[in-house]
Design a protein with these regions (language model features):
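C-terminal membrane-solvent junction of multi-pass transporters and transport-like membrane proteins
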Residues: 266, 408-419, 455-492, 497-500, ...
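Extracellular/periplasmic helix-exit of transmembrane alpha-helices
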Residues: 251-261, 322-357
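Loop-to-transmembrane helix boundary motifs in multi-pass membrane proteins
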Residues: 166, 204-211, 309-331, 400-434, ...
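Membrane-interface loop-to-helix entry segments
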Residues: 217, 222-256, 321-325, 444-456, ...
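Cytosolic C-terminal regulatory domains/tails of membrane transporters and channels
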Residues: 1-81, 527-685
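Hydrophobic alpha-helical segments and their helix-loop junctions in multi-pass secondary transporters
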Residues: 240-270, 337-344, 456-471, 520-529
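Extracellular loop-to-transmembrane helix junctions
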Residues: 111-161, 167-170, 186-214, 326-330, ...
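Helix-loop-helix junctions that connect adjacent transmembrane segments
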Residues: 237, 244-296, 498, 502, ...
Length: 685
């Protein structure tokens, strides 16, 4: 390009760079100056969009952008992803909070079942807790093998699909998706219940408060992984420290013979039970109590699923975090269980006050330390739902990349978070929380089944992997995973049998339905891929035939004139069509049309029923039947200056565009005309 631009210059290919040839100071000295577009920079042969390119141009967009940045923070480039990794402390807070926080309610859920046989059955509480911790030890050992075998992320879906096939992998994925939703719902409900323990008036608003917690978690996660870790690390460690102090104080009092009297709940269970512990009924009751207490095992898979989010070396840091998580949970869970049984604490039948609150109140009374323990417990339980917000979007993105979920789930937002998955999880878990009225006891029967099903499948898959690869020490590794598969499989059966009538059967129905949905999505994407794929890149593209262009014209004005001019630029076969509601208006429009110099052939449709869009659609259908060429509908769209002015117009073009959206063999082109108050051009006469 030179300084002199002639009218006969050949059309240039548009570019973000403008090159001008300049004359130097010396004769014959010429150079090229390159003018770069703002908002983009060159890197190699690519244009890289800078943050400036994301800023909206209009005032309303700028206001929205400011609000969004206040809520979610400024956008992060892909290069900043490395800085979003989790250290061991923040990884324990984000990925381990679900498992650690379940120590606050696992004992109570087991005791609620034992209470059906009377408070004398509470002697089985500690043995059940020991059994749960034993299973957890096996699960932690098995999950460490998952981290070792899949250092790039060993979610149950990936492990199972890789070793057992697609269908078992989808079963594991469906189970985990359900488990993540329930993690958010159960943790939030438990957190609100912990608050209502020292503020009973809140019990009537558990659903509303829970929904607020979920919304705050959603916003926190939309801000990105690192900021979520900073937000959530504090409550996790305050909870651990306060519970450690409480346990030490409780053990000291017991060791010195100073056993405190048990605090009374608002509505205690009776001393006499409804069933007996003798015979098969008693054995089934103990199994049900173990099934309820095994809720403490949930969340132990989150670290193995989130290995890629850890700092390097990822496998080592993930393993350390996993072991610390298991030790922390076991210590708090066994300690609270022993104190509750020794002191003689009875759960609250009304679910107003938690067992954690009763034990704390028995030891320290209503003191500042009591509020510290309950406050940190409440916050951690609510924030433990963050495990779901970490796992669900990541799993959904993997499924989306494998074309088993909508592709929107694979896209990262401006803060490097899987925004679509985060919002979807918040909505679904909020609905589940509201449907069960925020009750932890009503939600527990649906819980744990998904995670144990995924555990069993992934551990079975690893056994097959070690047998196939036969690496050094494969027998020991296969033995560990085989033990994990057997133990988690037995727990799964126990939970299903014990909780079947209470709602576990719904999970057995939901998992196949979700798998069927995932397969249907995959089938659609596969069919679409087969239809769109270009098999040979060296084939020439066929020259398209000019289409039939139909221009609906409501009134003869500048917007219509611009649409017709565009239509004539893409095809010689242009037909305007006008729908009139009476013969008089039809004749008036035809008279104006014949006086207009830019006219094209016109058809007028009289619609005595005053309907505009259906006659146009039938007209387009009839034209399509008579001609094999594709049809292009060019719509004149009037765009007002302000948003409120948009409400003053009928938006017929928008309704017609929506009606034509799924019509085959039809191209819809929108030609917008922006109205400017400062310049009112002359209209066609």
């Amino acid at each position: 390009m030179t300084d002199e631009k002639g009218d006969d210059e050949a059309p240039r290919t548009p570019s973000l760079e403008e090159r001008t040839t300049k004359s130097g100071r010396l004769p014959g000295n010429r150079y090229v100056r390159i003018h770069h577009s703002s908002g983009f920079r060159r890197r190699g042969g690519l244009y890289v969009a800078e943050e400036e390119a994301l800023r909206p141009a209009n005032a309303a967009g700028r206001v929205y952008d400011v609000i969004r940045r206040i809520l979610f923070g400024p956008p992060l480039s892909t290069e900043a992803e490395e800085g979003e990794r989790l250290s061991v402390p923040t990884g324990l807070a984000i990925l381990g909070s679900d498992n650690i926080s379940s120590s606050a309610y696992a004992t109570e859920e087991a005791m609620r079942v034992l209470a059906l046989a009377g408070i004398g059955a509470f002697v089985f509480t500690t043995p059940i807790a020991v059994a749960v911790v034993g299973v957890l030890a096996i699960v932690v050992l098995s999950q460490s093998q998952v981290i070792r075998a899949y250092p790039n992320g060993g979610g149950s879906y990936i492990v199972t699909s890789d070793n057992l096939g697609t269908l078992p992998g989808l079963v594991a994925a469906a189970a985990l998706l359900i488990d993540y939703v329930l993690t958010v719902a159960v943790s939030t409900a438990a957190g609100v219940q912990a608050i209502s323990s020292f503020y009973p008036e809140l019990h009537a608003y558990v659903v509303q408060v829970g929904l607020v917690f979920i919304a705050l978690l959603m916003i926190g996660n939309l801000r990105g992984v690192r900021e979520a870790g900073i937000m959530f690390a504090g409550p996790t460690y305050v909870y651990i420290a306060s519970l450690a102090a409480l346990l030490l104080y409780g053990f000291f009092r017991l060791a010195t013979g100073d056993v405190p009297p048990a605090a009374l709940p608002p509505l205690p269970f009776g001393t006499e039970g409804e069933v007996t512990l003798a015979g098969p009924v008693g054995a089934l009751l103990i199994l049900r109590a173990f099934a309820s207490g095994s809720v403490g095992l949930t969340g132990s898979e989150a670290i193995a699923n989130g290995v890629p989010s850890m700092e390097k070396p990822e496998p080592r840091n993930a393993t350390i975090t996993l072991v610390i998580m298991g030790i922390t949970f076991a210590t708090i869970f066994l300690g609270l269980t022993f104190l509750a049984q020794t002191i003689g604490t009875i759960p609250d039948r009304s679910e107003v006050e938690t067992l954690n609150s009763l034990v704390t109140r028995s030891l320290v009374g209503i003191s500042p330390f009591y509020y510290l323990v309950q406050g940190s417990t409440a916050i951690l339980l609510a924030l433990a739902a963050n495990t779901g917000f970490t796992g669900f979007p990541r799993l959904a993105s993997v499924l989306a990349n494998d074309r088993f979920m909508p592709r929107q789930f694979a896209y990262r937002g401006e803060r490097l978070a899987f925004s679509f998955g985060i919002v979807a999880l918040a909505v679904v878990s909020g609905l589940v929380l509201a449907a069960r009225r925020g009750s932890v006891t009503e939600l527990i029967p649906f819980y744990t089944i998904g995670v144990f099903l995924a555990f069993t499948l992934s551990q079975s898959g690893l056994v097959r992997r070690w047998r196939r690869l036969r690496v050094h020490g494969w027998q020991w590794r296969a033995g560990v995973n085989a033990l994990g598969a057997v133990v988690t499989g037995v727990v799964l059966v126990v939970v299903l049998v014990a909780k079947f009538k209470e709602g576990a059967w719904l999970i057995l129905v939901a998992v196949p339905l979700i798998v069927a949905l995932l397969l249907a999505i995959h089938r659609h994407y596969r069919q679409m891929q087969d239809a769109l794929v270009i098999e040979r890149l060296d084939d020439e593209v066929a020259e398209p035939k000019p289409p039939i262009v139909i221009v609906p014209v409501g009134r003869l004005d500048r917007a219509a004139a611009r649409a017709i001019a565009f239509a004539r630029s893409i095809s010689p076969a242009v037909k305007a069509v006008h729908v009139a509601t009476s013969e008089e208006s039809a004749n008036e429009f035809r008279e104006r049309w014949e006086r207009w110099k830019g006219k094209v052939p016109l058809d007028i449709i009289e619609s005595p029923y005053r309907s505009l869009v259906p006659p146009l659609l039938r007209y387009i259908d009839d034209i399509d039947k008579r001609d094999a060429r594709p049809i292009t509908v060019v719509l004149a769209s009037f765009v007002p200056h302000s948003w409120w002015e948009w409400l003053l117009h009928s938006q017929t073009a928008l309704r017609l565009k929506a009606s034509l959206l799924f019509r085959p063999n039809t191209i819809v082109v929108d030609v917008p005309y922006h109205f400017d108050h400062g310049h009112v051009p002359e209209q066609p006469r």
